[in-house]
Regions:
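Conserved Class I SAM-dependent methyltransferase catalytic core
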Residues: 25, 34-47, 241, 306-380
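Short, contiguous acidic/charged loop-to-helix segments that flank catalytic cores in large enzymes
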Residues: 29, 289-309, 335-344, 364-370, ...
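Conserved nucleotide-binding/hydrolysis micro-motifs of P-loop NTPases
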Residues: 45, 238-239, 283-286, 334-337, ...
Length: 506
């Protein structure tokens, strides 16, 4: 067995996990939802300081360049970091009682010097409630990231650490963490199936930007160029938007991410965008989305979604933003596959009849932090006869992946690389893609796992899109709506029916 290296150079097995455990230990009794901003802000600060140092050293070696000229860094697409904001200065003062103010001053100086970061960075490290000894120890810990590495390697490691920390804090927060972080297992399935090699990538409820990070990884891993994709997103939670902006910066992703507190439904900041790929994990079964104020909206081409549930609002918002040959992958509650409430069944029928549904995937439970219920993936296609794929018009692929994945602890399930490949290769082989056919062979229906259905068959099933009904597996559908909400809704419906019955009697 190889000896474990002592420096955190990224080669160690479970390096990010060990670092997160050490950082998490320092938070003591502080709530994870608060502590994540402390830790992630510092990781970001270390990242841009390391990136700055890479250019700084390059300019120092050039006798005709000025390493203290901010314009030189702009030309290198690197953030300018004033002297008082550089990591070395903070590390040297980590044990000082004024370290909180020094970090705040550093954040403000960086925002002032870089317009794209204005209003993004956390600036409350000096608050009395934040333990300054803990803060100093956290700075020392983060200082070890990328130690003894070249600057470019250090930047990559910091990007990985930021992503791992996001996931770690989401896990610690449980259900709340799912509001800004989509589990990697789900994001990988989405990106591997959609294959966003080139074009415009959009997420209308982007959280901390995980869909964009994985899209960038996909391009790199498959030999593409990062410059071939352009990223667009919108987020209505300002705190989460800040996390996303920092996440994009530490990954070196040029992203156009908008924020307003009304959200994509009521103030679509990217109204004219037509995207080639849309990846989204909208909040499930949202009842207070203001749908009653959007009854005649142009996006509701396939039917007006109920004011009591935004699921079909999200699907139609996404379809509205697809380019003529665009494809989308959307995470939704299982109830979206079968609900007939308030006209949802009619909308689903219209989506099927307009041949927009390409593939449905049933997922197992426990993929989300703090949520045991399973969910599903909708894959939508504006055109099922695009160049490079076989003509799939009039067909829908159903995949039941509920038996895949492994419980990595008592409450969380994850997909292995083989699990992800089994799902995505099945889809690609069905679409007639050579690379998948070479690995898996020609597409064939597999009892209990996958089935290619005609639209007539879907009609026979009443336009219910539950994969288990098509592949030959039993239904285990949980619509994700808490019992008390469901009970209250049914009670209201019953009361309404009683009232109508009384009117008829009178």
């Amino acid at each position: 067995m190889a000896k474990e290296q002592k420096s955190n150079n990224g080669a160690n097995l479970g390096f990010e996990a060990k670092l997160f455990l050490a950082a998490d230990k320092l938070r003591g009794s502080m709530d994870a939802s608060e502590y994540k901003h402390v830790a992630l802000g510092l990781v970001f600060l270390k990242y841009i300081s390391d990136a700055f140092n890479t250019v700084f050293e390059k300019l120092q070696a050039d006798e005709f360049a000025d390493e203290e000229d901010a314009e030189e860094y702009l030309a290198e697409r690197t953030f300018w970091v004033p002297k008082e904001a550089r990591w070395g200065h903070l590390q040297a003062n980590a044990k000082q009682p004024t370290i909180g103010k020094l970090v705040d001053d550093a954040m403000l100086a960086i925002e002032k010097s870089n317009a794209s970061l204005k209003g993004v960075l956390p600036t409350n490290y000096a608050r009395e409630a934040l333990n300054k000894t803990m803060l100093g120890e956290l700075i020392d810990l983060i200082s070890t990231i990328g130690m003894n590495e070249e600057s470019d390697k250090s930047k990559d490691i910091l990007g990985r650490v930021y992503e791992y920390f996001l996931g770690g804090f989401a896990g610690a927060e449980g259900k709340r963490g799912g509001e800004y972080f989509t589990p990697r297992s789900i994001v990988r399935v989405l990106t591997e199936m959609l294959e966003p090699y080139k074009g415009r990538v959009y997420d209308p409820c982007c959280g901390s930007g995980g869909m964009f990070v994985q899209s960038e990884k996909f391009v790199v891993e498959h030999g593409g160029r990062i410059g071939d994709i352009r990223v667009y997103g919108q987020e209505m939670n300002n705190t989460t938007w800040r996390l996303a902006k920092m996440n994009m910066a530490v990954r070196g992703i040029d992203a156009d991410i908008k924020w307003n507190n009304e959200g994509s439904f009521h103030k679509d900041e990217l109204a004219d965008l037509k995207a080639d790929f849309i990846l989204a994990n909208p909040p499930f079964n949202i009842s207070d989305w203001g749908g009653d104020r959007l009854r005649e909206d142009v996006r509701w081409k396939y039917g007006t979604p109920p004011a009591s549930n935004a699921n079909y609002g999200w699907l139609q918002h996404i379809i509205h933003h697809l380019a003529p040959n665009g494809t989308a992958g959307v995470v939704l509650a299982n109830g979206s596959m079968s609900s007939n409430s308030s006209g949802e069944g009619d909308i689903r029928q219209s989506l099927v009849e307009h041949d927009l549904v390409d593939c449905m995937v049933a997922l197992p439970g426990n993929l989300f932090y703090g949520v045991t219920i399973p969910c599903c993936l909708w894959f939508l296609a504006k055109n099922k006869n695009t160049e490079g794929f076989r003509n799939r018009k009039g067909e829908v692929l159903f995949i039941d992946a509920r038996k895949l994945g492994t419980m990595v602890n008592r409450v969380v399930r994850e997909f292995s690389a083989d699990d992800t490949a089994q799902i995505s290769d099945t889809y690609h082989a069905w679409r007639g893609e050579e690379h998948a056919i070479e690995r898996r062979g020609e597409y064939e229906d597999v009892s209990g796992f996958c089935y290619s259905a005609s639209l007539d068959e879907v009609k026979t099933h009443g336009y219910v899109l539950i994969p288990g009904r098509f592949v030959g597996a039993e239904d285990e559908i949980d619509d994700g709506i808490p019992f008390d909400e469901k009970f209250a809704s049914l009670r209201d419906v019953l009361s309404e029916q009683f009232a109508k019955g009384k009117e008829l009697e009178d």
